[in-house]
């Protein structure tokens, strides 16, 4: 057995072991602290996202108007329930039910299974919502990290950014950073996504950081590491409106719609690269601190 402690309290659930500490909040709806040798990796808890910053092609095709509900659906989602299950003396699972801020109030589940090795499994599930709803721009989580964790090494399609409809890339291990991955478009927009990722390491200059890998039997995921959140990119009209980076923003996605671009302005995304709202989606990744 691993030398560690699992503490199930009224407000929080804590797991300690191997120099790592995991703190899951009942009231705040998820992971509120994740440390390794006192290095903190959570500035804001990983939050459900159903949105991506509009691209020039999105704007030209009217996607903002058509998909406005998804901008707020994840951002204003509320936690309506939680369930704590102690699996054994070294493992605990915290499951949260979120209600998306849509007229349908679709329920999304987010669960963390943590053990005393300090590893955490993160599972996010969208059940699909029947009805005539606009397609979803993206689904997964966005996580705010301290600014020093700006280096990215990943095993996936690369080395440049890739999307469902932009995959002229090779599968391999690639190294980049959040600043290189931020394309300075005249009008800020979605940028820096990587598809078909098996694992990714987000580190500081000393190599300390976070490792994300697809769980056993799970599909590869999409991800990006940026010095700006998707909402900061969406709000800015020009690059000079973006502030000096104070945090890093990690997006880990089950799926993201394509970006289109058969021409330079009004070319919509082809139907096969949309995400139907009635399509169930899940994301299953393992987290570890390095």
Label every model-predicted segment.
Residues 1-290:
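Beta-strand/loop-rich accessory regions of lumenal/periplasmic or secreted enzymes
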């Amino acid at each position: 057995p691993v030398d560690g402690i699992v503490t199930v309290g009224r407000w929080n659930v804590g797991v300690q072991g191997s120099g790592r500490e995991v703190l899951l909040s009942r009231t705040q709806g998820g992971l509120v602290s994740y440390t390794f040798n006192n290095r903190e990796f959570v500035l804001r808890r990983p939050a459900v996202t159903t949105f991506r910053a509009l691209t020039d092609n999105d704007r030209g095709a009217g996607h903002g108007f058509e998909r406005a509900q998804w901008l707020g659906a994840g951002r204003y989602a509320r936690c309506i329930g939680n369930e704590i299950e102690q699996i054994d003396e070294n493992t605990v699972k915290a499951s949260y039910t979120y209600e998306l801020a849509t007229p349908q109030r679709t329920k999304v589940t987010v669960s963390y299974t943590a053990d005393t090795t300090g590893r955490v499994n993160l599972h996010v599930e969208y059940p699909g919502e029947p009805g005539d709803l606009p397609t979803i721009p993206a689904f997964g989580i966005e996580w705010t990290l301290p600014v020093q964790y700006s280096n990215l090494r990943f095993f996936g399609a690369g080395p440049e950014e890739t999307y469902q409809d932009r995959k002229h890339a090779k599968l391999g291990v690639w190294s980049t950073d959040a600043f290189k991955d931020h394309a300075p478009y005249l009008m800020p927009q979605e940028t820096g996504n990587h598809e078909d990722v098996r694992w990714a390491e987000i580190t500081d200059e000393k190599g300390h950081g976070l490792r994300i890998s697809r769980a056993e039997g799970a599909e590869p995921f999409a991800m990006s590491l940026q010095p700006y959140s998707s909402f900061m990119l969406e709000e800015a009209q020009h690059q000079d409106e973006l502030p000096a980076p104070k945090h890093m923003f990690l997006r880990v996605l089950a799926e993201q719609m394509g970006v289109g671009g058969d021409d330079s302005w009004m070319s919509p995304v082809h139907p096969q690269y949309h995400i139907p709202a009635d399509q169930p989606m899940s994301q299953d990744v393992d987290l570890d601190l390095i």
